[in-house]
Amino acid sequence: MTFFGPKVLLLLTALIMSSGRTPLGVSGQRGDDVTTVTSETFTEDPNLVNDPATDETVLADIQPSTDDLASLNDKNTTTECRDEKFACTRLYSVHRPIKQCLHQICFTSSRRMYVINNEICSRLVCKEHEAMKDELCRQKAGLPPRRLRRSNYFRLPPCDNVNLQGPSGL
């Protein structure tokens, strides 16, 4: 049983790999010698052509229908959205390698540095969302909703847990 030790298995593996034969299921491809694979035709009908799609045919297939365009136009007119740009400056903490030399001995250490990234971000702001945010702020402040303001209707805000008993003196 000592014949099948780890040294013999390692030797057999080296012999198989050096002989140019590869075990089943292993392909010896590198990134630079990959060949292109042609697609096979799975139909026997000679009228069907299996040519790769060109840019014109792909773009012709993707054109939206008139129903899609109408729904997009309706959506844009009802929501009244705008693209709002704002500054979103971020502070990043990174480790940068610093090379320090004393006479002829050099060593590299990594120090934490802070990088400020000034960016301009954009977000889509819709009129409906702004109205909903205003309504939530009014409710949190304890004010009545705008549509019921003149009818002397007052309700407690549903967002907050309001203690109706008040603080106890104990």
UniProtKB/Swiss-Prot annotation:
Motif Cell attachment site: where in chain: 30-32
Glycan attachment positions: 76
Tissue specificity annotation: Associated with fibrillin-containing microfibrils of the developing nuchal ligament.
Cellular localization per UniProt: Secreted, Extracellular space, Extracellular matrix
A Gene Ontology term for the protein's cellular component: microfibril
Keyword tags: Disulfide bond, Extracellular matrix, Glycoprotein, Secreted, Signal
Quaternary data: Interacts with TGFB2. Interacts with BMP2. Interacts with FBN1 (via N-terminal domain) and FBN2.
Protein name: Microfibrillar-associated protein 5
Species per Swiss-Prot/TrEMBL record: Bos taurus (Bovine)
